């Protein structure tokens, strides 16, 4: 059976653990190597036991620990070519970096990882679907400016999903952010609102997803209760809904 946890989720850092049997992988490596090691340890996983890290995009909150993990643990790092080029420009140097097309499939132990494109203001942003040998799967998709067909297709056949619920539109518009930052977040390559997340969640449940986690919540423009209530109102009551903690592990499925 596949297990998935958000280690932490938000602008201060993002990382998720997916494991099945003896195989464990990370999706992103934000925050610090020590923070990731501590979070993994609380779940009974040692950092050197992680087989691979799959990077969604090059923004700091998703790669903060990447260079140190690659250097000290020698863990293989997988990224799209565009993201790999961006990592090189950010002086990430490592012989463990594996470059892939935007859409690719990679097997790691008894897990299979498939990427799909997402709309965000980065070099080549992707989400991931991870499945075990029985086909049990989880979809992980954050940092997207609008709902896209690639995401809706990717969720097909998954049992769980981690979806972005970044902001409440009214809180963002009336909040303290400068105009340029509000425009970026609300743009088609910005971040997904609670309302749009609810639409994705409703569709996901129609596909058969039974475990939903809300991630990448803005600390200034959202609250866990507001995100939860907005999405909860759109989905069946028997679907397990959780909000990812910013600083501690949260079980997704």
How does the language model describe each region?
Residues 27-30, 51-58, 78-81, 139-142, ...:
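Active-site neighborhood of phospho(di)ester-bond hydrolases with catalytic His/Asp-centered motifs
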Residues 59-63, 84-86, 122-123, 146-149, ...:
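Active-site environment of divalent metal-dependent phosphoester hydrolases
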Residues 5-15, 56-66, 84, 88, ...:
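Structured catalytic core of nucleotide-sugar glycosyltransferases
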Residues 1-43, 126-143, 160:
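Conserved beta-strand hairpin/beta-sheet module of binuclear metal-dependent hydrolase folds
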Residues 149-245:
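Cap/insert and terminal regions of metallo-dependent hydrolase folds
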Residues 64-73, 89-90, 222-229:
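Metal-dependent catalytic neighborhoods of phosphoester/phosphodiester hydrolases
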Residues 81-135:
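Metallo-beta-lactamase
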Residues 33-79:
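Active-site metal-binding motif and surrounding structural segment of the metallo-beta-lactamase
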